[in-house]
A protein has these predicted regions:
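Nucleotide/phosphate-binding sheet-loop regions of phosphoryl- and nucleotidyl-transfer enzymes
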Residues: 1-172
Length: 172
């Protein structure tokens, strides 16, 4: 996961796949938390350009309603309500539903990176990358860091992508 570019995790999740994950793994909280947090909120913000703060308002409204402070205190029914709220928000702001077709979502995400993405343009400018070289889109399988207390993920680079220093750089 690059610290320099937008990241959309779990692009392949949709209403059907989230049920399959819950069924196969046996962890409904993980499935629905991943769906609301990574795909709807990230994709909605980065690709569909619905402000991240608007998603946070939906989430905070539900946390206030059920009387909790932290996301991990929400129950599964609350996560499902958050997901419904996020979808309603997207429909209201964009006048169409959150896309369930994973291939269509992938195309939209790639278009954002290769399109007029301000973060990509800034990255190209700062690193003096010629327009003839362009940028890349990485599509990889993800290690889940939110499956429980024994899960973690991270990233590592050499050289440091922020400074160019020839040293190890990473985070978990």
């Amino acid at each position: 996961m690059s610290v320099m570019m937008d990241t959309i995790l779990n692009l392949g999740l949709n209403d059907k796949i989230v049920v399959e994950i819950h069924t196969k793994i046996g962890n409904e909280r993980f499935a629905y938390d991943s769906y609301r947090r990574f795909i709807i909120q990230m994709f909605g913000d980065i690709v569909m350009e619905v402000p991240y703060a608007d998603f946070e308002k939906v989430l905070q409204g539900i946390k206030d309603k059920v009387g909790v402070k932290l996301d991990n205190e929400l129950k599964i029914k609350d996560f499902k309500e958050v997901i419904a709220g996020y979808k309603k928000l997207i429909n209201k702001k964009k006048r169409h539903e959150f896309p369930q077709d994973v291939q269509e979502r992938l195309k939209q995400a790639i278009h954002v990176i290769f399109g007029n993405n301000p973060m990509a343009i800034t990255y190209i400018f700062i690193n003096d990358i010629p327009h003839t070289r362009g940028i890349a889109v990485n599509i990889v399988a993800k290690v889940f860091s939110n499956m429980g207390d024994t899960s973690v993920s991270g990233f590592a680079f050499t050289p440091n992508p922020a400074t160019g220093e020839k040293a190890f750089f990473g985070d978990i």
